[in-house]
């Protein structure tokens, strides 16, 4: 691991297979949906209106988009007519708000894992209407000897954590390779190969088998096309890309068949990684070596701080750092850090314009620190699901866009985590 002093602490984090390796202690997350409760926070004054009925949607172990699709189908409503502020975790018990035009009448739903409750009127909800989220998270499987260390961590939790984009943002990244970066560098074949051959364990067997076949027979598009027909593959992405490659063997042209939603995901993943790297570099200027802790994740390492000087905290708590976008003029500290990170990536600012078919890098600013509000820390109790172990529940609010899992990592620095297997 280069550029990490031996004085700095290092932990290995693997969110993708839902386990985290640290000092030899254990904890368990999401053993049941009620262990991870998420509640949307919205300003009802800002969404005031009379065009739609406003509903509270409570779901358990269901993805938001699947819940929306179910509601649309059940009540014969076009999916586009369901307004929402954000998407919520699947493996959780979540509450969020949706709006549906009044012309569809007053709706109600009360099923074991899905409940729709009419609570009033509003305008049509959009993603920007979300203020934040309230989390109530129960951590289980704790050993008695680890409790003093955890208590020490919790004392400093009010100072928050770096506001990193967490692993959930990087589902399209494999072996630390970004599709967007490969496109920028003109490696179109590699970009297509990542897309057509790499897969997550959670993908359907039909698609995993297809990707393994494509990988094994890479370049033999006639043979791959026959496999697609024989196995009745319906996905337009694979059908159209392989058909184009069979016809022209043009990898750049094949990428044009990727839908816009996926293209945005690829660009956002790389831009988010670059932002993480910039913030990590910035924090090195403020955090002494002995207070640094590193976690390994899909894209490299994330640097946390064990504690932070109050004077430094006051400097950073409201400070923002911009995303990297080629059409923006940066200056001072920001320019210095961005140039250093791009140099490490083997890129220039101008080359980011080569993103081409995938879209563009969008400029925005994001707070450097994620600071939990209304933080409540429960007592250590006997864990009824893990004999001889302990549990604790944390409750806190975060601004929209911040990841609850980052705060959990900060709270349990030095504790080995094992999440529920999917």
Swiss-Prot record:
Its EC number is 5.4.99.27. The active site is at residue 89. CDD domains: PSTD1. InterPro entries: PsdUridine_synth_cat_dom_sf, PsdUridine_synth_TruD, PsdUridine_synth_TruD_CS, PsdUridine_synth_TruD_insert, TruD_catalytic. One of its GO terms (molecular function) is pseudouridine synthase activity. GO terms for biological process: pseudouridine synthesis; tRNA pseudouridine synthesis. It holds the Pfam family TruD. It catalyses: uridine(13) in tRNA = pseudouridine(13) in tRNA. Residues 160-371 form the TRUD domain. Could be responsible for synthesis of pseudouridine from uracil-13 in transfer RNAs. Belongs to the pseudouridine synthase TruD family. PANTHER family: PSEUDOURIDYLATE SYNTHASE PUS7L, TRNA PSEUDOURIDINE SYNTHASE D. This is Probable tRNA pseudouridine synthase D 2. It comes from Methanocaldococcus jannaschii (strain ATCC 43067 / DSM 2661 / JAL-1 / JCM 10045 / NBRC 100440). The lineage of its organism: Archaea, Methanobacteriati, Methanobacteriota, Methanomada group, Methanococci.
């Amino acid at each position: 691991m280069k550029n990490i002093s031996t004085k700095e602490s290092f932990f290995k984090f693997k969110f993708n297979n839902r386990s985290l390796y640290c000092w030899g202690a254990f904890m368990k997350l999401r053993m049941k949906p009620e262990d991870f409760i998420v509640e949307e926070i919205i300003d009802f004054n800002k969404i005031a209106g009379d065009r739609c009925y406003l509903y509270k949607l409570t779901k358990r172990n269901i993805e938001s988009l699947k819940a929306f699709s179910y509601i649309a189908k059940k009540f014969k409503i076009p999916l586009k007519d369901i307004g929402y502020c954000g998407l919520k975790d699947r493996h959780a018990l979540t509450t969020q708000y949706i709006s549906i035009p009044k012309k569809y009448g007053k709706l109600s739903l009360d099923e074991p894992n899905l409940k729709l409750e009419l609570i009033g009127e509003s305008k049509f909800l959009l993603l920007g209407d979300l203020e934040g989220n309230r989390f109530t998270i129960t951590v289980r499987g704790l050993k008695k000897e680890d409790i003093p260390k955890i208590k020490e961590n919790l004392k400093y939790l009010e100072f928050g954590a770096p506001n990193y984009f967490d692993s959930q943002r990087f589902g399209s990244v494999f072996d630390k390779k970004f599709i967007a970066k490969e496109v920028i560098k003109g490696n179109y074949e590699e970009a297509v190969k990542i897309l057509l051959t790499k897969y997550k364990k959670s993908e359907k067997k039909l698609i995993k088998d297809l990707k393994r076949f494509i990988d094994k027979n890479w370049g033999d598009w006639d043979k791959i096309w026959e496999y697609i027909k024989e196995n009745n593959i319906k996905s337009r992405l694979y059908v159209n890309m392989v058909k184009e490659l069979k016809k022209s063997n043009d990898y750049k042209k094949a990428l044009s068949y990727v839908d816009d939603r996926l293209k945005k995901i690829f660009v956002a993943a790389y831009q988010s990684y670059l932002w993480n790297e910039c913030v990590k570099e910035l924090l090195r200027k403020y955090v002494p070596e002995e207070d640094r802790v590193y976690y390994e994740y899909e894209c490299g390492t994330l640097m946390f701080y064990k504690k932070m000087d109050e004077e430094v905290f006051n400097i950073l708590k409201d400070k923002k750092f911009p995303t990297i976008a080629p059409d923006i003029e940066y200056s001072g500290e920001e320019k210095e850090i961005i140039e250093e990170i791009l140099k490490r990536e083997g890129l220039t600012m101008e080359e980011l314009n080569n993103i081409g078919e995938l879209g563009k890098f969008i400029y925005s600013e994001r707070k450097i620190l994620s600071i939990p509000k209304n933080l409540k820390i429960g007592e250590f109790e006997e864990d009824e699901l893990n004999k001889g172990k302990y549990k604790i529940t944390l409750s806190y609010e975060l601004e929209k866009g911040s990841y609850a899992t980052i705060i959990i990592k900060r709270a349990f620095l030095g504790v080995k985590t094992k999440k529920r297997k999917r």
